[in-house]
């Protein structure tokens, strides 16, 4: 019986992979990933067993990984962040449902951007928080507005993914809704290109959100009413 590992690789930095992930990637027969992840790992692992394709060819990548596992191979398919958070884990599990007696599947967690970004900012998620995607592909506009209204009133800390995908239109909507219920001085943090050479960290306020500074690699953290900035560079939500 073949085995399929569905692995989250965080931001693609080798040094932030879990030891479990490194051991699996050294042992499997094949590794499927997108071209960006391929570029990150082809020097750390045997590139002859890595099969990379275009980022937007997710469906084909999943199908090929499943087919290889059905042929009896031990296979890994990689996704950024954690594959169970806006990732490929659900795609794989839905597609192999009828083959569960022929493939052994393991979901291997990765460090999602909410966690790695929070660590760079300080400790913005000490209390309850929500994670919301602003992706045009995943976010139904009407449902998104309803979610944002509820979250704005709740005073939860919020992490926004895909804030510029493909435009900042949904980000503008989100900010305007939050400003209806929260102080314009609410602390926000933006992390871009986490643990990469062009990494950028920004601290600001909800009213002064720098739209011109965000891109497809940015994650937005919105604090609650207790969130503050220490020493002009650390974002903290007090525990007590």
Segments predicted by a language model, with ranges:
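A contiguous loop/helix-start segment that scaffolds small-molecule binding in enzyme catalytic cores
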Residues: 4, 153-240
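Fold-independent oxyanion-binding glycine-rich loops
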Residues: 9-11, 33-36, 53-55, 80-82, ...
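A polyampholytic, Gly/Pro-enriched intrinsically disordered region
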Residues: 73-79, 124-134, 154, 206-216
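Short gly/pro/ser/thr-enriched loop/turn and capping motifs at secondary-structure boundaries
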Residues: 38-40, 58-59, 112-115, 137-139, ...
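Short gly/ser/thr-rich secondary-structure transition/capping motifs
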Residues: 9-16, 138-141, 202-204
